[in-house]
Amino acid sequence: MSSPRSFFWVQEYFTPWDYTARAVTRILAYRKTPFQEMLIAETGAFGKGLMLDGHWQSTTVDEFLYHEALVHPAMVQVVQAGGIPRRVLVLGGAEGATLREVLRWRSVEQVVMVDIDGEVVAACREHLPEMHQGSFEDPRVEVVIADALDFLQETGPIWDVILSDLSDPIESGPAYRLFTQEFFRQIRSKLQPDGAFTIQAGPTGPVELHQHTRIVRTLKTVFAAVQPYAIYAPTYGGPLGFALAAQDPISPRPEPEQIDQILSQQLDPERGALQFIDGITLLGLYQVPAHLRRAIAAETVVYTLDNPPRIE
């Protein structure tokens, strides 16, 4: 006689016709907050994971791929532009893993994390210590539970790096306004002249790359330099895009030795070595595939508050 099944399947839809299923073995936290539906669970293969509105945000097995790719290109860009990344603003990032990566940099004096959903932040703080690794307790960190737009309107142009670690811009979610031209103009106005901004910019697979190309197109109407790139992390079921934006030039072919030297000089060795990003990896990330370059060049849609991201 077979034993009762000790897991259940959680489906994540990428299009109305395609989904992946992940085995969940234990629910650690579940709730519907005023902003979104949250699940923190143990999975069969990917460790603990955070799901918001039916989409996996990260899992402990491969989150380093995402969070290192989000944080370190922008920090390196500031150094290459002649600046020092002292003050960093994180938008979203409830798991605390983005904080963890920022705090590796010895030059960092202040990190402010702004998240609209205090319930999700509290749940991640309790259930995902593998991700945040105590970063919420670092004296350089301040957590603000607020709308990112409201916070940006009140803060000054003091930030060396701004990182947008937000959930996908679905119409029913809390983040869709934060992918618009108006928001990116606010971001630009709050950066130091040699500052840098990185945003998680949607999937880049051929079936669903329109969101990525439109985010990149929108950024190019605001910033002088924009560098798209993408990673593959199994949690997401396909390639996931980012975009780095700045007013200073961004080299699409960074010298690996120079990047390695910057990382060696700037990162705190007591916080452990990076698992993903180094000079060769960064050079590879910036080599955008031909199909994606063509799609970005052909894109005409600009996201605005009157024409925000929509599910298609």
Swiss-Prot record:
Does the record's keyword annotation contain Transferase?
Answer: yes
Catalyzed reaction equations: S-adenosyl 3-(methylsulfanyl)propylamine + putrescine = S-methyl-5'-thioadenosine + spermidine + H(+)
- Major site of localization recorded for this protein: cytoplasm
The record's GO CC annotations read: cytoplasm
Q: Give a GO biological-process term.
A: spermidine biosynthetic process
Is Phosphoprotein there in the keyword field?
A: no
Enzyme class per UniProt: transferase
Q: Which residues form the active site?
A: D165 (proton acceptor)
Its pathway, per UniProt, is: Amine and polyamine biosynthesis; spermidine biosynthesis; spermidine from putrescine: step 1/1
EC number per UniProt? 2.5.1.16
Give the residues the record marks as binding S-methyl-5'-thioadenosine: Q36, D115, D147, A148, P174
Q: Binding of spermidine: at which residues?
A: H67, E95
InterPro entries membership: PABS, SAM-dependent_MTases_sf, Spermi_synthase, Spermidine_synt_N, Spermidine_synt_N_sf
Role noted for this protein: Catalyzes the irreversible transfer of a propylamine group from the amino donor S-adenosylmethioninamine (decarboxy-AdoMet) to putrescine (1,4-diaminobutane) to yield spermidine.
Q: Which PANTHER family match?
A: THERMOSPERMINE SYNTHASE ACAULIS5
Q: Which NCBIfam families match?
A: MFS_SpdSyn (NF037959)
The family annotation for this protein states: Belongs to the spermidine/spermine synthase family.
- Write down what this protein is called: Polyamine aminopropyltransferase
Coding gene?
A: speE
